[in-house]
């Protein structure tokens, strides 16, 4: 899921933190790519014309393998050295989110079956994409493929994005590659997005610089993590009523999430007390009565007064009913917000979520060795062609490209040799009567020059 609304905030408040590149400009870079996110992307995007996933003759899914093989070759052809990082065991705090995702997939399956009966082809395609689940077999097959290709793989102890960030921070790679913005929350100094997108999309690579983002938002790393949690992350139920703008405003106003939570809980308690007081006042309101009791001997005036009293009661009851309906409607509309405000869920362990971001379970970068090797051509043919039904000609051509580019001596980047120095200001011009103005000559200079030239001719 990543961090909701973070990209929009950076575009608005820290535009200098985001740059766009053509993939060709990234030659010479090493990148740690979130493989688990890539598998999910390929299972959704790499499909047949009818919208179904690619399969071999045995009915086995091959979309993920097709995606990894050809997208990795494209990356390598452009002079980039990828290393893929796979998810390990998810944090305990994430289990609730994973459970909800499972429920949504089951709902999508049921809706997909119904769409097959009465829906359009677009409906069927949409629901089938929502049912995608990355399995253990998908992971194992992708790891096997990448090793045969000579591309390094790392199995993270927990979150792949956190391990990518660690490798970038430790200098093993230049950047982390993922679509999840929480890679920045894990303190990745540089994040590449859209690196594994299809070339047909013509989507430029987006580079996000964490230091520039913090500077633009005017906050430190701890506050940035607080902001990301408040925006909505993978570990906590989002707070209804808090959008990107209000989240940024709250963190800036109160300085941190601890103070924000205390403030919101106090406001929620005050609103609750106020609502209870209003309910008590309404319950104590006396039924409307006539102000004047008319005597019985006023020639039928008593009957007229009774009718007026009944009308007043009727109007009062109608007004009370309308007020109750408006109150119920308002409560329904602001459900979870506490009478039009923001209300934090009772169980909202943000401190635990913050610790996951600040101290993630990762392998230290200095304990990881990334090595790019020659591809095992015959191994690739056996796995992709014999077992998975790929075209042998295409597999061998792809292997040739891997051999050529993975083993080629990488051309150094100019930004690795040169340091950009600030432009020096020109020396100050002499001041006073004796100073000659730039682009002008003193009287007599033209004459002297002219006579000098004439003398030379002689």
Swiss-Prot record:
Cross-referenced Pfam families: XPG_I (PF00867), XPG_N (PF00752)
Keywords carried by this UniProt record: DNA damage, DNA repair, DNA replication, Endonuclease, Exonuclease, Hydrolase, Magnesium, Metal-binding, Mitochondrion, Nuclease, Nucleus, Phosphoprotein
Residue sites binding Mg(2+) 1 per the record: 34, 87, 159, 161
Start-end of Basic and acidic residues biased regions: 310-329, 442-452
Binding-site list for Mg(2+) 2: 180, 182, 234
EC nos: 3.1.-.-
Stretches with biased composition (Acidic residues): 275-285, 293-309
This protein's record includes keyword Mitochondrion: yes
GO MF entry, a single one: 5'-3' exonuclease activity
Matches recorded under CDD domains: PIN_FEN1
Recorded family membership: Belongs to the XPG/RAD2 endonuclease family. FEN1 subfamily.
Subcellular location: Nucleus, Nucleolus; Nucleus, Nucleoplasm; Mitochondrion
Gene Ontology CC: mitochondrion; nucleolus; nucleoplasm
HAMAP family per record: Fen (MF_00614)
Enzyme's top EC category: hydrolase
Alphabetical GO biological process terms: base-excision repair; DNA replication, removal of RNA primer
Stated name of the protein: Flap endonuclease 1
